[in-house]
Amino acid sequence: MAKFTPASLPAEFLDTMRDIMPSSLSMEDFIAACQRPLRRSIRVNTLKISVDAFLQLAQPYGWQLEPIPWCQEGFWLLNAEEENTRLGNTLEHLSGLFYIQEASSMLPASALFHHNDAPGTILDVAAAPGSKTTQIAARLNNEGAIVANEYSASRVKVLHANISRCGVSNTAITHFDGRVFGAALPEYFDAILLDAPCSGEGVVRKDPAAMSHWSQESITDIAATQRDLILSAFHALKPGGVMIYSTCTLNRQENQQVCRWLQAQFPDACEFESLDDLFAGAERATTEEGFLHVFPQIYDSEGFFVARLRKTGSVPPLPRPGYKVGKFPFSPVAHKDRALLTEAARKQGIRWDEELLQLWQRDSEVWLFPAALTSAFGNIKFSRIGIKLAERFPKGFRWQHEAIVALADPNASNAYALNDRIACEWFQGKDSYPEPLPTADELILTYQNTPVGLAKRISSRIKNSLPRDLVRDGASSARPLAKE
């Protein structure tokens, strides 16, 4: 494991923390926590495997897993520094069975579903790399719909890769400045998660360089952007809907003051909802407003802030955007073709709920779009919607990797379970020569009963068809090496 270099904390930052630190906490503990390495943590992806099944699977690995109190699917991996294998290259991670996610960043999605709220259409304003989007999708069990927005072009590809790896089917990706949604989709979303860009004061344990450009001036600029984002998000939220505002920073200017500013704009339409009962021990981090202000020493985690706001009534709309979205490039698949496509997919072992996902087409491409989002088509431009199911050819369909990962039946007649050795070869982009040979010519490959791809058997060889951008030369099992 790389040597940990503690962060250098600016004196002005420490003075700010000293001024806002609750009397129940000490600066000495705060500084000590900031200068310790961050505990590794993972979240079980219940779209692929149950928590109980994952714990049983992980038993032989020697992992010491401690439950994270605010996320039933989350665990601290206490002996991560003893592991020689990088978690991200394990077969279990590449197969989407778990997501490497910092424990504190699991708080916003947990707060969104507090009191078992199950909103239908959700906006994730700043979604990359996808940890919270995939957590929300798992809580929804791929029902409803999520718009996952990312402003940074370089991070959109990573966002899609993580959504695909985790088998998420109910999500559309957009690439906008988050300030557009209030005008473009007024009062459209049942719930919104705004994990706002921030000064990053809480991440020094993971990124000691995070404080290298810290200044009060930059915080003032960032807070202005946050106010713009939360205002737009509030306009995009339905009356009665819930918004989670979160940051990975600690100062009040980017946290409490942003939330209070929004409430001051709409005193009759914005209420704060307390998170003091979100989990056992939450009161240790709860502010007088009911926000969670998580200093790193409280739970031995990253510093974090989470607020839950309720929109209690309509507000005057923003001016409609002046730009034109352009013609929507997809059209619904005709009824006759739908039946043909659905039957062909089922023969291949691919199934979906036709009430949740609908067939659309563009030229030779066939897609499955979340039904809950159809009213948004034509109002904003999407970078990607749902799942690319197939490409049409004169002699049939070429089924797409992401459709197999999300929708294939691991118990289909053409499914073939990979052992650790062949699964490593698959993710390394290599052909395999398995024994015994599979009988089918076109195979749904599975690992730990989860689909990982589609391949053809050619004589005694499984031809590797994993998309090149998913190949990992270092792919390896988390299982201790043993004879197969």
Curated annotation (Swiss-Prot):
Show the active-site residues: 248 (nucleophile)
Predominant location category? cytoplasm
Q: What is its EC number?
A: 2.1.1.178
Residues that bind S-adenosyl-L-methionine? 126-132, 150, 177, 195
InterPro entries, alphabetically? Methyltr_RsmF_N, MeTrfase_RsmB-F_NOP2_cat, MeTrfase_RsmB-F_NOP2_dom, Nol1_Nop2_Fmu_2, Nop2p, RCMT, rRNA_ssu_MeTfrase_F, RsmB/NOL1/NOP2-like_CS
Location comes to: Cytoplasm
- For this protein, what reaction is catalysed? cytidine(1407) in 16S rRNA + S-adenosyl-L-methionine = 5-methylcytidine(1407) in 16S rRNA + S-adenosyl-L-homocysteine + H(+)
Q: Which GO terms describe its biological process?
A: rRNA base methylation
Q: Show the Pfam families listed in the entry.
A: Methyltr_RsmB-F (PF01189), Methyltr_RsmF_N (PF17125), Methyltranf_PUA (PF13636), YebU_pre-PUA_dom (PF21150)
Keywords, sorted A to Z: Cytoplasm, Methyltransferase, RNA-binding, rRNA processing, S-adenosyl-L-methionine, Transferase
Enzyme class (EC, first level): transferase
The record's section on SUPFAM superfamilies has: S-adenosyl-L-methionine-dependent methyltransferases (SSF53335)
What is one cellular component GO term in this UniProt entry? cytoplasm
Q: Which family does the record claim for this protein?
A: Belongs to the class I-like SAM-binding methyltransferase superfamily. RsmB/NOP family.
Give the function comment from the record: Specifically methylates the cytosine at position 1407 (m5C1407) of 16S rRNA.
Looking up NCBIfam families in the UniProt record yields: nop2p, PRK11933.1
Name under which the protein is recorded: Ribosomal RNA small subunit methyltransferase F
